[in-house]
Amino acid sequence: RDVAPSRGLGDVYKRQLQTTPELTADNVLSGKFMTEVENYTSDQILLRDFWTGARSALQRLEGRQDISGTYLGADGRYFAKVTDDTFNWDNYQKNLAAVETFFTANDGKRCTALIVPSPAGVLRDSLPEDAPYYDEDRAFAMLEEHLGTAFADARQALAGVADPYYHTDHHWTTAGAQAAYHIWAEATGHTARSYALVQATDRFRGTLYSKVLLPDSVYDEVDYCPDITIESADCDGTVTDSLYDMTALEKKDKYELFLGGNYAKAVLRTGVENGKHLLLIKDSFANSLVPFLCGDYETITMVDLRYCREKIQPLADEADDVLVLYEITNFAADGNLFKLNLK
């Protein structure tokens, strides 16, 4: 059965859409069959996206402000819908306890948790009126209770940034990441550096856009810091000499500009000769913040517990400082924090 009608909407894409490929010996031998299969698959995805966008536009006309688990906020901002019922409070409590235990086991090191507020927590005024949202104040109170002074609170700093998060993606902007870096520096006794941000692209639509596919969605600018350089980055065995993957700018997910995406373990050699080593336990929010940390450490080991199979304590033993960096709803949902304390 066809995924979508084999004809139709061709004028939308300025060409006739590929019909179902015909399987014949001549077509297979000539290579025509595989070419038509590729075109057909591509066209069905285009049709699916078209209908998703059309459905979202109709729902918006009907007054819906919650489409496919995404709130349509003010100023073209989209927010992931997270309520008290969907925020994983039990797992959040377990993860806080896991980090607390890990920090206690490494009390001879400077251990910091930078748990990032969700976009809607900072930009509450941009949420649709009366939109249900989880109690982030309660979540941060629990953070402070478990981690005390080891918790670096970036909420106020992010609220002072003009665009701390992308409009159509769940990540923070580079400006937001830099503001949080200043909070980390203050909390850990480092002298914060300020870097000029340079536009890498102004054509970014992110993960939340992909859920609604509204054609009038905002494009975001993605900035980076070309002045920050390193000697090498070993990302799961692939070695590069840059913090930035410029080829990501030609792809859909332009946030992969930062290190090219997520890895089980990435080891950065910064070229700073101070002998200091940071262990960074992280989600994808850290990818755009880590460049700002490179001036303070000779080595930074980044670990994503979703993919890493190594024991973490031996990595901590090699480090001078530890930073746990997650966006708060990612932190609550992650089922891998127990790995911190595996012996």
Please tell me what each predicted stretch does:
Residues K109-P117, Y133-D163, I183-E186, T191:
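Extracellular serine-dependent O-acyl
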Residues L17-A98, G121-E129:
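Serine-dependent acyl-ester chemistry module
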Residues D2-Y13:
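Short, small-residue-biased leader/transition segments that mark boundaries at the very start
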Residues S126-E136, V161, H167-T174:
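Long, hydrophobic, well-ordered secondary-structure blocks that form the structural core
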Residues Y78-M142, A264-I300, L305-R309, D321-V322, ...:
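Conserved, well-ordered alpha-helix/loop/beta-strand core segments that scaffold catalytic motifs
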Residues V12, L127-P132, F338-N341:
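Short secondary-structure boundary/capping segments
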Residues H170-W172, G176-H277, K282-I300, R306-R309, ...:
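Extracellular/periplasmic envelope-modification machinery, especially enzymes
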Residues L9, L147-G148, Y297, E318-D320:
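Short, well-ordered alpha-helix to beta-strand connector turns
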